[in-house]
Amino acid sequence: QNDMGAYMAIFEIMAQHDLSLTVKFGVQFGLFGGAVSLLGSEKHHKKYVEAIGRGELLGCFAMTETGHGSNVKSLETTLTYDKTRKEIVVHSPNYEAGKEYIGNALHGTMAAVFGQLIVDGVSHGIHAVLVTLRDENHQLCPGVKVEDCGYKIGLNGIDNGRIWFDHVRVPLDNLLDKYGGIDENGVYYSPIANENRRFFTMLGALVGGRICVGAGALGASKVALDIATRYALKRRQFGPEAMEEQLIMDYPSHQARLLPRLVKPYIYHFALDNLRNAF
């Protein structure tokens, strides 16, 4: 808990064996779990964190949209508060507002959905709400549509999908309200008055996952270069008949291609270590 170094180490080691598993791990614990832990309040921690950690509650991180990519501030998904029923209505107003390339989309039972929080007709910017995707029989809940992204050229162990919401209602308590919530009178409140500052504070709480992506890439590159180096020290290449076969590592042309790449993981390792310490 709260140990970025340990989490990065897990990411790097997992990436040396199975990148699909690494991404699934990151989605479950880093993105979905991180959203609940870092954007939610104590009531969310008590209700969900242990189940997420045990893998009993599988979840998604539904931020990216088809029409907006990583332009989070322009997301079209709406989270509209219904005062009379004390519920939040989650809605995708069009195809482009669908959540795109979401990991765990085919297995997840809940999603942290990001969208524009609207109270009394006024948008208070991007917030996140927990939405149940599937019931106890793993059937999609009413108003939830999920579409598989299909075969990919890699990482096919990840169930990437698209998700749309058609006026799906969730309790007000499902709003992750650490940086902004709605009180019992239906009035919006936030410890950060400035919307832009609040937006960047929310996103900043999740930046640790970006560091872990680098750790995973580093782990994969170490394995690839280890294989390439060992192979170069065993594989022999024939030449003129009178000469003995030579190791391909003895060829200057092979050294020129391989050795600079062998140096880079050392550089990235120390750079990531420095970034972890700064974080």
Label each PLM-derived region with a short phrase.
Residues 1-55, 107-110, 269-272:
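Internal helix-loop-helix
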Residues 35, 65-70, 96-98:
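Sensory/regulatory domains in signal-transduction proteins
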Residues 54-63:
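A short, Trp-centered hydrophobic/proline-enriched beta-strand micro-motif
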Residues 83-145, 162:
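A short core secondary-structure module
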Residues 101-104, 164-209, 229-250:
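A glycine-rich, basic-preceded beta-loop-alpha segment at the flavin cofactor/substrate interface
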Residues 141-167:
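Flexible, small-/acidic-enriched active-site or ligand-binding loops
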Residues 204-279:
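Extended amphipathic alpha-helical segments enriched in small hydrophobics
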